[in-house]
């Protein structure tokens, strides 16, 4: 992606703060990627991954601010109950529904992992940098929307 493609872009980062340290690492990666691309951004915080799609939907429908795209950041770590599957599947499905049915450019940076060690490897900028990857995905989807003539 070139900086020219991202000129004047404004992105909303929605971060779930269930795991504060991991959330911080994901956010740093996303912010750094958006800054390098020259995109401006706002950040809103929600309690957990299930609330991320709702926050994006609220922003899209009710916000007085126009967002070209969205970055979803969070972490779901498998526990001893079925709750992991519900949160992982439903948060991802809801983001896909927003992308497909509402034509939103969303980068999904919700980690779904077995343990905290896997989460840290994926969140750290000097390792997998999934926060940065989610921001880059959002920027790519914004560019793709523009390519197909959708400027909203």
From Swiss-Prot:
Pathway entry: Cofactor biosynthesis; riboflavin biosynthesis; riboflavin from 2-hydroxy-3-oxobutyl phosphate and 5-amino-6-(D-ribitylamino)uracil: step 1/2
Please list the residues that make up the active site: 83 (proton donor)
Q: InterPro entries per the record?
A: LS, LS/RS, LS/RS_sf
Positions with a binding annotation for (2S)-2-hydroxy-3-oxobutyl phosphate: 80-81, 122
**Family from the record:** Belongs to the DMRL synthase family.
> What does the record give as the function of this protein?
Catalyzes the formation of 6,7-dimethyl-8-ribityllumazine by condensation of 5-amino-6-(D-ribitylamino)uracil with 3,4-dihydroxy-2-butanone 4-phosphate. This is the penultimate step in the biosynthesis of riboflavin.
The record ties this protein, via NCBIfam families, to:
lumazine-synth (TIGR00114), PRK00061.2-2 (NF000814)
Question: What is the name of the protein in this document?
Answer: 6,7-dimethyl-8-ribityllumazine synthase
- The protein's organism comes out as Bartonella quintana (strain Toulouse)
Record lineage: Bacteria, Pseudomonadati, Pseudomonadota, Alphaproteobacteria, Hyphomicrobiales
């Amino acid at each position: 992606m070139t900086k020219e493609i991202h000129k004047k872009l404004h992105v909303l980062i929605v971060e779930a703060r269930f795991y504060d340290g991991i959330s911080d690492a994901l956010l740093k990666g996303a912010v750094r990627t958006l800054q390098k691309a020259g995109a401006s951004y706002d950040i809103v915080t929600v309690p957990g991954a299930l609330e991320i799609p709702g926050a994006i939907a609220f922003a899209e429908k009710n916000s007085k601010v126009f967002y070209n795209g969205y970055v979803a950041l969070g972490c779901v770590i498998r526990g001893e109950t079925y709750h992991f599957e519900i949160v992982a599947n439903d948060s991802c499905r809801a983001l896909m529904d927003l992308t497909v049915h509402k034509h939103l450019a969303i980068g999904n940076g919700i980690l779904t992992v077995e343990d905290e060690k896997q989460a840290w490897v994926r969140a750290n900028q000097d390792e997998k940098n999934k926060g940065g990857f989610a921001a880059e995905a959002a920027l790519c989807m914004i560019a793709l929307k523009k390519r197909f003539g959708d400027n909203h």
